[in-house]
């Protein structure tokens, strides 16, 4: 069975990688779908995020990285995918994700959303936190893959925030 794990992944963190690996133990195929979130200002472009994720996940089989502009359910319907994977770090994530799952179900009745609880050691990590700490010169190497740490340093040297 194929599932999609969508997100802005700006940048991908070890928490995301943990969810991806755990989802791959459940599903035969997983599409990591890089999406635009109009409420977020991204440091990396869609294509940069896609390339970075492909580098990070290059040793995993059964995973594909794709990008999508627009409604998530349109992508799912177009590709015949009926399972959505979401990671939950806290109760506040659950409230938002439940609303999104219900809205997506209304738009695509065949869709099922599977929630994976974040591993405790990654439960506090978010892409926003990573960017903020990196911006102020903090060490984020325990929170992101090495490829991401390098890319963050390069972006910050360029003056992109």
Swiss-Prot record:
It catalyses: (R)-4'-phosphopantetheine + ATP + H(+) = 3'-dephospho-CoA + diphosphate. Its cofactor is Mg(2+). The record marks 16 as: Transition state stabilizer. GO terms for molecular function: ATP binding; pantetheine-phosphate adenylyltransferase activity. Pathway: Cofactor biosynthesis; coenzyme A biosynthesis; CoA from (R)-pantothenate: step 4/5. It is found in: Cytoplasm. This is Phosphopantetheine adenylyltransferase.
